[in-house]
């Protein structure tokens, strides 16, 4: 079953979701909306990427449409999502990747244009949140607007689930060492809500807040209130790493914990989502990785049998975008069975 998809917002995530959809095979992107990028510029932005390299395929403009690998994609330039003709383009599932329409009410406007479901590629204040490998079984066909959570929650939640299921997390603190994102400044500039966030991205390690750890409690209810965290923004273009420090109820050696994570990474539930490596890796080794979370066995450390630091890498662009595709594929399958 090929699922027909529309993308609203052709920024970092929008473009990389499109790349992943082409690789994924189960999804066909039939429409893209972005009021700030004209068609010729879309071709350029999709073809060339400073982080992920040139697109290995054909990209061209023909008859007012974007053609990728000789397949036509309708292009819209609407500022108001209510005016996007998703239905006419055949897009049933819409990826909301502008970062602007992240509530049920705002993202729900896409339904007016003929979309059946909307997947928000960001955390949402009120939409049901799903993390592949963690809580997809909680999805119900009546949900019209869902959130794919954040890239950091997608990295942390599968790891936390494995640890909690096997050793019971009493409490934990997470730090994500996070690559630069589009909202940051190239040089110092105004950022009234977050003064540190206004400092030059290339010149600084910038402490920042993140709701990613608390959000794990939304997808794993038994961890609600047991995790929180913060972020350091660092001057790299892509790939981030989660550092989870937690107290566990059931004591275990670091070797035992490693073995449990390795076994989980090979299970049908988490294969392709949770990775495992014992290599002496660094961040660029994970550019283009499609897993949500790659556990670094050599980097972690245990103080004793109940207090442990666990380290897991993620391509915050590519891995996250692959999960957006996986989530759409999953919910479309559930929806089809429910009809």
UniProtKB/Swiss-Prot annotation:
Location (main, coarse): cytoplasm
State the family it belongs to.
Belongs to the glyceraldehyde-3-phosphate dehydrogenase family.
Please list the residues that bind NAD(+).
Answer: 12-13, 34, 79, 316
In which domain of life is the source organism classified?
Answer: Eukaryota
**Effect annotated for changing residue 114 to S:** In strain: B-3501
Report the pathway entry.
Answer: Carbohydrate degradation; glycolysis; pyruvate from D-glyceraldehyde 3-phosphate: step 1/5
Impact noted for substituting residue 157 to T: In strain: B-3501
**Alphabetized NCBIfam families for the sequence:** GAPDH-I (TIGR01534)
Where does this protein reside within or beyond the cell? Cytoplasm
List, in alphabetical order, the GO biological process terms annotated in this UniProt record: glucose metabolic process; glycolytic process
Matching Pfam families, A to Z?
Gp_dh_C, Gp_dh_N
Origin organism of this chain?
Cryptococcus neoformans var. neoformans serotype D (strain B-3501A) (Filobasidiella neoformans)
- In this UniProt entry, which residues are annotated as the site Activates thiol group during catalysis? 178
One cellular-component annotation, GO: cytosol
Residues binding D-glyceraldehyde 3-phosphate: 150-152, 181, 210-211, 233
In its UniProt entry, what is this protein called?
Glyceraldehyde-3-phosphate dehydrogenase
Q: Which UniProt keywords apply?
A: Cytoplasm, Glycolysis, NAD, Oxidoreductase
